[in-house]
Amino acid sequence: MKKILSISFLIFLISLSNLFSSDFEPGIGFVLPLGASISQKSQIHNANADKNNGTLSGKSAFEFGFSITPGMYKGFDDYMGFSIALDLGYHRDVYSYKENKLGGSQYKEVSTKYSFDTINIGLLPKFNIARFFIGIGGGIKLLVSGSEKTQNYNEEKSQFFDSETAYNFNAIKNKFKNPFVPYIKATFDYLFFFDNEIALGIGLYAGYDFGPQIKDERFSKNNLGSFDIGGQISFYFVND
C-alpha cells in the first residue's frame, strides 16, 4: 500500500511539473479590496468565572487592503485557463463587538473594537472561464500592530470612560496567544481585456479570518473571528 501511495505521489509530482513547464507564463495582479467584516467570537468561561462579564456579541465594521498576486498563468485570455499565485499584501482588519462589562454592581454593554495592521501571505489558485476569474485560497496574516478601543469602569468616579490602547508587535504577543491568524477566501472577478496580456477585473470577495485568541484568566477560550465580504478592483498583467 505504501508503494502504491509513493508511486501515485511521484506521478502526481511529475504531472504537476509537466503542467507548469508547458504553456504557463509569469504574471502579476494588483488587487484593491473594500468591504465589511462581520465579527464572530468563540468564548468559554472558566468554571469559577462570572459568565456575564466579558461576553461579546458581534458587530460589523469597514475594512480595506491592498494585495499583489505574482504567479504563473495558463490560458489567461483563452476560454478556459488556470493560474496559481501567491497572495501577498496589507490588510486593515477590524473586529467590532458589543461587550458586557461589570461596573460597580451593574452590567453595561459597551462598544469594543480591535483593529490590526496585518501582512498576509498565502496561496490563491484561480480558474478563468470565459471572462470570469474564480479563486479559492488561504494563508496566514501576521499582526504587525493594532489598537483596542473600549470603555472601562472607573471605581473612584463610579462611571465608565473611553479607553484606547495601542499595540506594537511585542504588545500583541503579550495580549494574544499568537501574533498571526489563518484565513481563507474566495474571489469572483469579471475581466475586461485591454489586450491578451492586460485586463481589468471588477468583482467580489468573501472570506473568514480565524482571529487571535485573547489571553484572559476569565476564559479557557476567548477567540475572535470575522466573516469578510466586499467588492474589489484588480489589474492583471500576464506575459502571454
Write out the residue ranges for each language-model feature.
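Positively charged n-region of N-terminal signal peptides that target proteins for export
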Residues: M1-I4
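Short helix-onset patch at the extreme N-terminus, typifying the N->h transition
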Residues: S6-S8, I28
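Bacterial N-terminal signal peptides
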Residues: S8-L16
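Short glycine/proline- and aromatic-enriched beta-strand/turn motifs that initiate or cap beta-hairpins
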Residues: F20-G81, S234-D240
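Outer-envelope beta-barrel architecture signal
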Residues: S22-F30, D78-I84, I119, A130-I134, ...
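Residues on the lipid-exposed face of transmembrane beta-strands in outer-membrane beta-barrel proteins
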Residues: F30-A36, F64-K74, L88-Y90, I121-I129, ...
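Extracellular/periplasm-exposed beta-strand and loop segments of Gram-negative cell-envelope proteins
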Residues: A36-E63, G89-N120, L142-V181, K185, ...
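Substrate-binding/catalytic groove segments of enzymes
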Residues: F194-G201, G211-K215
